[in-house]
Amino acid sequence: MDAFYIISTATLIALSCGLLGSFLILRRMAMVGDAISHAVLPGIVLAFLISGTRDSLWMLAGAALLGIFTTFLIEFFHKRARLQTDAAIGVTFTWLFALGIILISVFAGQVDLDQECVLYGEIAYVPLDLWITASGQVLGPRALYVAGAVLLINIAFVYLGYKELLLTTFDPAFAASLGLSLSLWNYLLMGAVSLTTVASFESVGAILVVALLVAPPATAYLLTDTLPAMLAATALLAVGISAGGYFLAAWLDGSIAGAIVTIAGLMFALAFLFAPRHGVVTRRWRHRRNRQAVTDSVYRAG
């Protein structure tokens, strides 16, 4: 049963990250997801200091606000200070993440809210943190319910805003001409990324969240040519990576999070090399075959 809880939680988190990560990849904003996953840390700490509790609603609210603030800072530095986007991202997320670490070490050092938990998480402990009702009924791991709720929110967000996300992603100029607010949908997407990130911190940590935001969608991007196909492939990869990572960790008696990232990296490497249309090896083989076909045609014509 523990294995089921761990795999289910990892799968739900991977699905949430992959769903949003697909739009980040298509918008060429993968590093923004990385920035937000680190920069929301001050929001988590400030939410704890204000509320005095680690209740998920406070944490989610703090993270969402910091995620939107991070996006605003990146845009501000890029447009007003004329910094390159990567430089603006680097300055913003390192400063905010360092601020969060200082806040933890100075103000929140007496509680179970530390750098190790935020960075690495520990998904193996998911079955131990149970949701117990007032009557004493055990409903299962709390992280599983949180991950499921966040996934439902993300699915609803993408479903209801699919047309707007599609237009603002692929043709911002046309979307603006239709009256769509590019900034609004950008901030909504970043807010969803923030919620997903903080909901996943305690279970899997920031590093695995970053990997799940980027690796499955990037792999699906190499394997598909349309957005619906990319989203479907991302979902399948999320399930396979989560289950494969758990069993690899069990076989090696190692870190589950590390094994999941390893499987994700292997999947991407295979797609990079052997994807039907975009794989490096596949393209070279196709080019060689076409060249041989042309040579044979010329030879027969001669």
Name each model feature, range by range.
Residues 21, 45-49, 70, 74-75, ...:
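Structural signal for membrane-spanning alpha-helices in multi-pass inner-membrane proteins
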Residues 257-302:
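Cytosolic-side transmembrane-helix boundaries in multi-pass membrane proteins
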Residues 138-216:
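Helix-loop-helix "hairpin" substructures at the membrane interface of multi-pass membrane proteins
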Residues 23-37, 41-113, 221-232, 249-252:
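Short loop segments and helix-boundary regions at transmembrane helix junctions
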Residues 14, 38-41, 63, 67-68, ...:
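Residue-level recognition of pore/gate-forming positions within transmembrane alpha-helices
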Residues 1-16:
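Membrane-interfacial amphipathic/re-entrant helices at transmembrane-helix boundaries
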Residues 97-157:
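Transmembrane helix-bundle core of multi-pass membrane transporters
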